[in-house]
Amino acid sequence: MEATAPRRRHLLPLLLLLLLLCGECPPVSGCNEKRMLAMLPRCGKTFAEMMKKVEVWKWCNLSEFIVYYESFTNCTEVETNVVGCYWPNPLAQSFITGVHRRHFHNCSVDRQQWQDPPDEILIPLIVVPILLTLAMTGLVVWRSKRAAQVV
């Protein structure tokens, strides 16, 4: 019993120190969505400030601002983790989507329209394999008949 008393005396200051140091730790109870939604706009504001350095006509070229976008993504991840939320989550994704709408609404993916090649190219591409298949089949049949006659 006497050995446990000194341990208990040291335990209380350690617990108090832990509580003091862990004042900014994420809550154990889970995600604090209100705090997350209050903190994420800082990331958006910082990203908007960085995007001002890029000319507007270059906003659709990811290579022009990839460093800024990476910083924005890291910021949203850190802010959601600080408040005890996982990342990505639906609220963070909707915030990120809003930032995308604000900055990249004029960027559309140009879908390439595929067309068949001209008939001069298409017909040989179809006919040659068919003729080769028929020729090889005929050759195999002819050789097998010839081999049967030799025996």
From Swiss-Prot:
Chain's role: Accessory protein that interacts with and modulates the function of G-protein coupled receptors including calcitonin gene-related peptide type 1 receptor (CALCRL), calcitonin receptor (CALCR) and G-protein coupled estrogen receptor 1 (GPER1). Required for the transport of CALCRL and GPER1 receptors to the plasma membrane. Plays a role in cardioprotection by reducing cardiac hypertrophy and perivascular fibrosis in a GPER1-dependent manner. Together with CALCRL, form a receptor complex for adrenomedullin/ADM and intermedin/ADM2. Together with CALCR, act as a receptor complex for amylin/IAPP.
Membrane-spanning residues: 117-141
PANTHER family: RECEPTOR ACTIVITY MODIFYING PROTEIN RAMP (PTHR14076), RECEPTOR ACTIVITY-MODIFYING PROTEIN 3 (PTHR14076:SF2)
Predominant localisation class: membrane
This protein's UniProt keywords: Cell membrane, Disulfide bond, Glycoprotein, Membrane, Receptor, Signal, Transmembrane, Transmembrane helix, Transport
The name this protein goes by in its record: Receptor activity-modifying protein 3
Subunit structure: Heterodimer of CALCRL and RAMP3; interaction induces allosteric modulation of CALCRL function and ligand specificity for adrenomedullin/ADM and intermedin/ADM2. Heterodimer of CALCR and RAMP3; interaction form the receptor complex AMYR3 for amylin/IAPP. Interacts with GPER1.
Glycosylated residues (UniProt): 61, 106
A single cellular component GO annotation: cell surface
Encoding gene per record: RAMP3
Alphabetized InterPro entries for the sequence: RAMP, RAMP_sf
GO terms for MF: coreceptor activity
Disulfide bonds: 43-75, 60-107
